[in-house]
Amino acid sequence: MERWADFQKSDDPYFFYPLQLVSDSQVQLYSPYVRVQEAIADVLTSFALHAHPKTRLLIKNHPLDNGLINYGEFIKGFAEELGIYDRVTYVEDGSTPDMIAGSRGVVLINSTVGLMALDQDKPVYCMGRSIYNIEGLTQSLPTTPLDVFWCAPKAPNQPLYRAFKRILNAQALVHGNFYSAQGISLAVADSVRRFEDSHVHLQPKHRQIVMRSRDEFSKYRKFGI
């Protein structure tokens, strides 16, 4: 297993693939995969056959993975069989935003890392269903096979993404997270405010922003973007 600091010493272009937890309901319910290894096998096989030979693949484990599945050994063995072991790097450390920033694009199932990549104007390929898997923002089946993405990654339409992001922030998200005391406190407080509001799904202060964003979003969708 290599470290992120060592990987950065090379100037070769690379794609970034963040792993998700096997217990993630987004994987179990909204993707064609049951096990994360199945997705890894698809990505490695496609990369071996269709990516430019000078291109590398950086795979990062999920920071909350419990280690019961040895993804490092699985990736090593599979990459060796495909003859691309020297082009595939698996890490468990390092900054995800930095990995996105240096990449040519991001391949994933449906991780929220996709939103981080769109924020950085990076091409994103989704192998599963996701709220952000929208034509003009990402590439995916049935329009674009993964085999094509390696050589023709497309950056997201930023006006479309900004409109999508405003709607998402106003109607679907609350501040906070599930992984820290501060994050949980913020999430509870913001959720209570959302439920107590007479407009549960649309707070009055956000109404004007959302309507403007919907108009922008519709404008781009009319042109098939």
Q: Would you name each region that the model predicts?
A:
Residues 92-138:
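A donor-sugar binding/catalytic signature common to diverse glycosyltransferases
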Residues 75-77, 125-126, 143-144:
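Short, hinge-like loop/turn segments at secondary-structure boundaries
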Residues 137-225:
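Leloir-type glycosyltransferase catalytic cores
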Residues 52, 83-85, 119:
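Short, well-ordered coil/turn elements that cap or connect secondary structure elements
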Residues 66, 130, 193-194:
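Class I S-adenosyl-L-methionine
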Residues 68-109:
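Donor nucleotide-activated moiety binding/catalytic core segment of transferases
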Residues 1-74:
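Conserved catalytic-core segment of nucleotide-activated headgroup transferases in glycan assembly
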Residues 22, 64, 113, 131, ...:
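Short, glycine-/Ser/Thr-/acidic-enriched flexible segments
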